[in-house]
Amino acid sequence: ISCQDVKQSLAPCLPYVTGRAPKPAPGCCNGINHL
């Protein structure tokens, strides 16, 4: 697993993590599961 893989997998989580979204996007959960 590379840093780029981690970055791509977790990118959909950024709005939630930074407080701009009230809940994680479906892609966030999928990205975490991929890791």
From Swiss-Prot:
Q: Where is it made, tissue-wise? A: Seeds.
Extract the GO molecular function terms from the UniProt entry.
lipid binding
The cysteines covalently paired via disulfide bonds are 13-28
Question: Is Transport among the key words of this record?
Answer: yes
Q: Look up the domain of life of the source.
A: Eukaryota
Q: Which GO terms describe its biological process?
A: defense response to fungus; killing of cells of another organism; lipid transport
Ordered alphabetically, the record's keywords are: Antimicrobial, Disulfide bond, Fungicide, Lipid-binding, Plant defense, Transport
Q: Which InterPro entries match?
A: Bifun_inhib/LTP/seed_sf (IPR036312), Bifunc_inhib/LTP/seed_store (IPR016140), Plant_nsLTP (IPR000528)
Question: What family does the entry list?
Answer: Belongs to the plant LTP family.
Free-text function comment from the UniProt entry: Plant non-specific lipid-transfer proteins transfer phospholipids as well as galactolipids across membranes. May play a role in wax or cutin deposition in the cell walls of expanding epidermal cells and certain secretory tissues. Inhibits the growth of F.oxysporum and P.infestans.
Q: What is the recorded name of this protein?
A: Non-specific lipid-transfer protein 1
Q: What is the lineage of its organism?
A: Eukaryota, Viridiplantae, Streptophyta, Embryophyta, Tracheophyta
